[in-house]
Amino acid sequence: YHHPIGEVFFSFIPTLLRKKNDKIIFDLDDNTEYKLNEEDKKLKLTKEQNINLSKLNKVEKFSPSLIYGVTGSGKTEIYLQLAEKFILQNKSILILVPEINLIPQLEKRFKDRFNGDIGVYHSRQTPNQRLKVWLRSKFGGIRIVIGTRSSVMMPLKNLGAIIIDEEHDQSYKQAEGFKFSGRDLAIKRSQIENIPVFLGSATPSLQTLKLVKEKKFKKFDLLRRVDGKKPPKLIPLDISDSPLLGGIAIQTMSIIEATINKGEQVLIFLNRRGFAPLYECDNCGWVAKCSSCESNLVFHKSKNRLICHKCESVYGVNKTCPDCHSNEINTLGTGTERVEEVLRSSFKKVPIIRMDYDSTRLKGSI
């Protein structure tokens, strides 16, 4: 990656190990034994799962394997049974996920299956938490670790395989500091250590599909849902001529209202946190930008602050334009806070929960 070797090492070493520290105390006998919970394993595999699992279990060395499974096809059960195989061989396994908020559900599934400690490693943990998982992994205290891209170089003892869930996700790429792709590093590490690497996705990246076509990756299909149900119906809406209410089309609001009136729930996905992605002057066109990285600042109404989502710098809100001194400053665009505000105003008696980085960053908030 054309980076200084020290910066590369520091990217994957816990903060507390980056300087000499004689106060670190670690119990080398703090090992966990993994016992299989047979009650959790009673689930009967589908024909597709059985066929693919038998083939995947034969992969012993480096041979990138794409587990292409539609949503609900049982990829997680495949992960669990692959992990069981390596645990029984007294090996470790690393499971990578693209986002921190995907960890709790996967961690629960592994805890339900294995009676033993499941290591979790990500950037929102305290330095002590990360250090403990890192050291226990290195000395064999824990042999199952679930983590984000920062865990890709975890020094697991006797590593048997790496699983990359949602391999297509762009969150595996780090854009600041030492720039790298956790997905690509995991594949390269598997090649160097000559161990299996399994990539799971319902929507594989074009890069992966190209490698499958070139027969450099093997592909295992799970095309049917475990429950036998058909995929949900997708209805595209043409909102080009529709008035918007806080970024939501009138047709969409009508569908939300009809769904609520039937006593059902609604999930709304929006990939922008904050209130508005632009804070600008209507008079001269000035746009609030970060002085550190030149990125556009995002207005967060709940904090009354302008925040850079790239470097996390925080600024006060300008009452007047710094260029033309006009008071005509407005927000442009829609973020999760604006959508929440509109929905609360439209459906006053309906409980509404906003889940994004700002509302779920504290421990226990999810």
List where the protein language model places each region.
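Conserved phosphate/pyrophosphate-binding and hydrolysis machinery centered on Walker-type P-loop NTPases
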Residues: 42-47, 60, 72-76, 96, ...
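Interdomain hinge/linker at the junction between the two RecA-like core domains of SF2 helicases
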Residues: 207-248, 295, 301-303
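Accessory, non-ATPase domains that flank or precede helicase/AAA+ motor cores in DNA-metabolism machines
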Residues: 1-201, 208, 213-229, 260-261
